[in-house]
Swiss-Prot record:
Gene: PETF
InterPro entries per the UniProt record, alphabetical: 2Fe-2S_ferredoxin-like_sf (IPR036010), 2Fe-2S_ferredoxin-type (IPR001041), 2Fe2S_fd_BS (IPR006058), Beta-grasp_dom_sf (IPR012675), Fd_pln (IPR010241)
Family matches, as PROSITE patterns: 2FE2S_FER_1, 2FE2S_FER_2
NCBIfam families: fdx_plant
Binding site for [2Fe-2S] cluster: 40, 45, 48, 78
Pfam families in UniProt: Fer2
PANTHER family tied to this protein: FERREDOXIN, FERREDOXIN-2, CHLOROPLASTIC
Protein name per its UniProtKB record: Ferredoxin
């Protein structure tokens, strides 16, 4: 079980959730009452984008982000499994472009 801190000062988000390594971060957040943006839930759009501040994830199921965006730390929370404790900035769709 990993601890995932979700933060976004502008949106008033600062909460830590528990997420097993076999559950998508978005699903775990919803189960624990955290309302995050999403649309397709399939890794094919950018609505749920977050930025990994600390930690690591497996998001091999995503098909939207390009290599540069991934190297800059962007993740899609709807298809990202945690592989360590993480700090993630939420609501990052606009920052992608």
């Amino acid at each position: 079980m990993y601890k995932i801190q979700l933060v976004n000062q502008k949106e008033g988000v600062d909460v830590t959730i528990n997420c097993p390594g076999d559950q998508y971060i978005l699903d775990a957040a919803e189960e624990q009452g955290v309302d995050l943006p999403y649309s397709c839930r399939a890794g094919a759009c950018s609505t749920c984008a977050g930025k990994l501040v600390k930690g690591s994830v497996d998001q091999s199921d995503q098909s939207f982000l390009d290599e540069e965006q991934i190297n800059n730390g962007f993740i899609l929370t709807c298809v990202a499994y945690p592989t360590s404790d993480c700090v993630i900035q939420t609501h990052q769709e606009e920052a992608l472009y």
